[in-house]
Design a protein with these regions (language model features):
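Short FAD-binding loop at a beta-strand-to-alpha-helix junction that anchors the flavin cofactor
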Residues: 1
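Rossmann-like nucleotide/phosphate-binding core characteristic of flavoprotein oxidoreductases
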Residues: 4, 8, 16-141
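Glycine-rich phosphate/pyrophosphate-binding loop and the adjoining helix
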Residues: 13
Length: 141
């Protein structure tokens, strides 16, 4: 049997150990002012980490001055830890098996979630989702 998500969990753990034990700072990638929304939409629609580890891993974009791709983090860590204003995007599954995207918005230390509607074809990059992601990003810019 396949072990789905193992490689993503190993990558997250290795990065966390490098930060805590070796003092190696996380590589983050700056995003242009207009890149954050399309980047998050693409991640919701296609990121294998999010699809293999639904509601466990999230793509994080922070907004401490300028938008930065902070990479993949465990969702629980994003929700529980302090940090700069940011948006964490993940894909979740309800009890009936319906898949839907969720944005967790951290602003001034408080977290709230924006649950987006499901799409039967998982087209989370479509215009309706763009408006939702834009609204979340505006909260933290």
């Amino acid at each position: 049997p396949a072990v789905y998500g193992f490689r993503y969990n190993a990558r997250v753990l290795a990065r966390r150990l490098a930060e805590r034990v070796a003092g190696i700072e996380r590589d983050t990638r700056p995003l242009g002012k207009d890149e954050a929304v399309p980047f998050l939409l693409a991640e919701l629609a296609h990121a294998p980490e999010l699809w293999a580890q639904k509601a466990y891993l999230a793509r994080v974009v922070s907004f401490d001055g300028a938008p930065r791709d902070d990479g993949i983090e465990p969702l629980a860590h994003f929700v529980d830890a302090a940090g700069p204003d940011a948006v964490a995007a993940t894909v979740e599954l309800d009890a009936s098996g319906e898949i839907y995207p969720v944005l967790y918005v951290r602003r001034r230390g408080s977290i709230h979630e924006r649950v987006l509607p499901p799409d039967p074809l998982n087209r989370f990059h479509e215009p309706g989702y763009r408006a939702e992601v834009e609204a979340a990003v505006r909260e933290v810019e």
